[in-house]
A protein has these predicted regions:
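Extracellular/periplasmic periplasmic-binding protein-like sensory domains
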Residues: 82, 87, 94-96, 101, ...
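Local beta-strand N-terminus motif with an aromatic residue
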Residues: 2, 41, 129-130, 176
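An alpha-beta-alpha
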Residues: 56-97
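Flexible loop/hinge segments that line or gate small-molecule binding clefts
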Residues: 15-51, 164-172
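Short, structured loop/turn "capping" segments at alpha-beta junctions
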Residues: 66-71, 97-105, 126, 130-131
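Hydrophobic alpha-helical
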Residues: 3-23, 90, 105-166
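Hydrophobic alpha-helical segments within soluble ligand-binding/sensing domains
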Residues: 45-69, 116-117, 163-167
Length: 176
């Protein structure tokens, strides 16, 4: 027996169908991190990711100032609604107020830190003049390591989300 369902999952068509079916039990559904939208009866507990992405975009714009420059967007999983909303908010903020910033690409790490670091390193080799990295995902340490290996690290801005112990350490070290 149970009184409710608490779920933390990516937005996936099979999960949405299962949640719709679960609604017939009249038990509450609490969705952590992912808002499954109006088609699924649930309570969403989590941040407003679109606004968080907009804030990140405004910060990137302010840090890069009028000079602007090239920026890379790092995603973990495109199926994660929150991450998608963050990226949409980030892009909207850049588009509406920072025309000197050019988003040169969006890479997806699959929530794999090592892959995130490699993708950033690869982008830096193709765009040595890259000025900013926006990470909508969880792989901050490996991205910071990739940035630490290039010249002019101080010219690059790295923005991410969350204040985990790992990110607190990176923030104190000046990597974020």
């Amino acid at each position: 027996r149970f009184d409710a369902l608490i779920i933390c999952a990516a937005e996936d068509p099979e999960i949405v169908v299962a949640l719709r079916g679960f609604a017939a039990t009249d038990k509450p559904v609490v969705a952590l991190a992912t808002d499954f939208g109006p088609d699924v009866l649930h309570i969403h507990v989590g941040p407003d990711d679109y606004r968080a992405g907009m804030l990140a975009g405004h910060l990137m714009g302010r840090f890069l100032s009028r000079e602007g420059g090239k920026v890379l967007v790092v995603a973990g999983m495109s199926l994660m609604v929150g991450q998608r909303q963050r990226r949409e908010g980030f892009r909207a903020a850049i588009a509406e107020g920072f025309s000197a910033i050019q988003i040169v690409g969006e890479v997806e790490s699959g929530e794999n830190g090592e892959k995130a670091g490699l993708l950033v390193a690869r982008t830096l080799s193709r765009h040595p003049d890259l000025r900013g990295i926006y990470n909508a995902s969880a792989d901050a340490a490996e991205i910071a390591e990739a940035l630490a290996r290039v010249q002019d690290r101080g010219r690059r801005v790295f923005i991410t989300h969350g204040l985990t112990e790992d990110r607190r350490r990176l923030l104190r070290a000046g990597a974020i």
